[in-house]
């Protein structure tokens, strides 16, 4: 194995120097080290730095000196001892020295331990802010994006010029790392994602496997089916917050392929994901494929297919609720469309007690499509588009207009999506 030789050298060759360096700083066991912020340590730091400097000058010509001071630099990065690290760097420590087990450099370790001041020191000494490790190909920015506790390091790396859109060999950027590392329950990388987006992260980034910024959200929504209700609520809240951020920075939730389209997924399960779907439509998301139109997939077709596949009976409350939510979704589609785009061969064959209502709903859409939209409808759509992004209803209510006109501008089903979630 490639690192066995490194182990042997640590133990028999430069480990004594590493131990001496740690000892000069009053560090006996880094794994069990007490807080370095305690007054007794801070008060004696000056004298410890002098002892360290004398030790390094005395050992400067000893065998494996550079390996020893470079390995000690990894310990300083882990503990956040910037003054000691600065001394080691001025006495020959190698910034590119890799941990023999993880192959991480001091910069990677500083990020993993959330030591932003150490990150800045290392970069100012010449560390490559975009360097990737040899095993996982993770950049410092990738590592910083994966945990909410590393937000200070993420901010510092961006301030120091880290490439926010650099991708690994699989095409994965820091934004995709932040999304993939979030589970919506224990790990919420919302602020990391916000910071990356504000720093210019590309919302169109796609891996070689086809993963997009919506892949994680679609996966997490699937995890809510049949799971713990409390966890499902947390996941839904996280998915809403992240979707809102992504849309605000230009992400398109209605692009092909269908299995990577958040709008398509929400339409397929509109009863379950109703609040998020309502938010998408009120935010201006296309209800058809945004690349190929209704010929690829159509929200109208998906909604009616779902209605017609639900047998139901007169007393079936779930079917009545399904119909109510379908009417809401269809109303939002109409409200935000200058001209309806119904799919070709848009025929339906409903069954059950609500078949007549479904047929009437279908007929009304056919009627709307067959006539030119009235001017008042075009004005309504134009004003609502102008007031985006979401929440449009709040902005409509703030307009200096008569209440009757405000009522017309509002969708019949506008409401607080955030409260629903």
From Swiss-Prot:
ANK repeats lie at residues 67-97, 102-131, 136-166, 170-205, 226-255, 260-289. Binds APS. Identified in a complex with ELOB and ELOC. Interacts with CUL5 and RNF7. Interacts with SQSTM1. The SOCS box domain mediates the interaction with the Elongin BC complex, an adapter module in different E3 ubiquitin-protein ligase complexes. Pathway: Protein modification; protein ubiquitination. Keywords: ANK repeat, Cytoplasm, Repeat, Ubl conjugation, Ubl conjugation pathway. Ubiquitinated by RNF41; leading to proteasomal degradation. It comes from Homo sapiens. GO terms for cellular component: cytosol. Gene3D superfamilies: Ankyrin repeat-containing domain, SOCS box. Probable substrate-recognition component of a SCF-like ECS (Elongin-Cullin-SOCS-box protein) E3 ubiquitin-protein ligase complex which mediates the ubiquitination and subsequent proteasomal degradation of target proteins. May play a role in the regulation of cell proliferation and autophagy by promoting the ubiquitination and degradation of SQSTM1. The gene is ASB6. Residues 360-415 form the SOCS box domain. This is Ankyrin repeat and SOCS box protein 6.
């Amino acid at each position: 194995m490639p690192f066995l030789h490194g182990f042997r050298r640590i133990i028999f060759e430069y480990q004594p120097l590493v131990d001496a360096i740690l000892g000069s700083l009053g560090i006996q066991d880094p794994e069990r080290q007490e807080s370095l912020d305690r007054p007794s340590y801070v008060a004696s730091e000056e004298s410890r730095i002098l002892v360290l400097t004398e030790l390094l000058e005395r050992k400067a010509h000893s065998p494996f000196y550079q390996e020893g001071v470079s390995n000690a630099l990894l310990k300083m990065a882990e503990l956040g001892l910037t003054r000691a690290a600065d001394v080691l760097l001025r006495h020959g420590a190698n910034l590119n020295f890799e941990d023999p087990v993880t192959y991480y450099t001091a910069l990677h370790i500083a990020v993993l331990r959330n030591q932003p001041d150490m990150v800045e020191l290392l970069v100012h000494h010449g560390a490559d802010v975009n360097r990737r490790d040899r095993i996982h190909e993770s950049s410092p920015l990738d590592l910083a994006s994966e945990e909410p506790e590393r937000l200070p390091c993420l901010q510092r790396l961006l301030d120091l010029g880290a490439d926010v859109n650099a991708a690994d060999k699989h095409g994965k950027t820091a934004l995709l790392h932040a999304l993939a590392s979030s589970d919506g329950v224990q790990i919420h990388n919302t602020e990391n994602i916000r910071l990356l987006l504000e720093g210019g992260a590309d919302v169109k980034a796609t891996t070689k496997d086809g993963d997009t910024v919506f892949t994680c959200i679609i996966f997490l929504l699937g995890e809510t089916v049949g799971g713990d209700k409390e966890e499902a609520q947390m996941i839904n809240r996280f998915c809403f917050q992240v979707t809102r951020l992504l849309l605000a920075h230009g992400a398109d939730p209605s692009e092909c392929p269908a299995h990577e389209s958040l709008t398509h997924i929400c339409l397929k399960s509109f009863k379950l994901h109703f609040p998020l779907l309502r938010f998408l439509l009120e935010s201006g998301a296309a209800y058809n494929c945004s690349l190929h139109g209704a010929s690829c997939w159509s929200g109208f077709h998906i909604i009616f297919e779902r209605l017609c596949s639900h047998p139901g009976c007169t007393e079936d409350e779930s079917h009545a609720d399904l119909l109510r939510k379908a009417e809401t979704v269809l109303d939002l589609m109409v409200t935000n469309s200058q001209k309806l785009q119904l799919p070709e061969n848009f025929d339906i064959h409903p069954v059950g007690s609500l078949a007549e209502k479904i047929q009437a709903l279908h007929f009304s859409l056919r009627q709307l499509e067959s006539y030119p939209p009235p001017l008042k409808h075009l004005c309504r759509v134009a004003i609502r588009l102008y007031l985006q992004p979401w929440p449009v209803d709040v902005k409509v209510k703030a307009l200096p207009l008569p209440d009757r006109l405000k009522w017309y501008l509002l969708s019949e089903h506008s409401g607080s999506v955030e409260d629903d979630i």
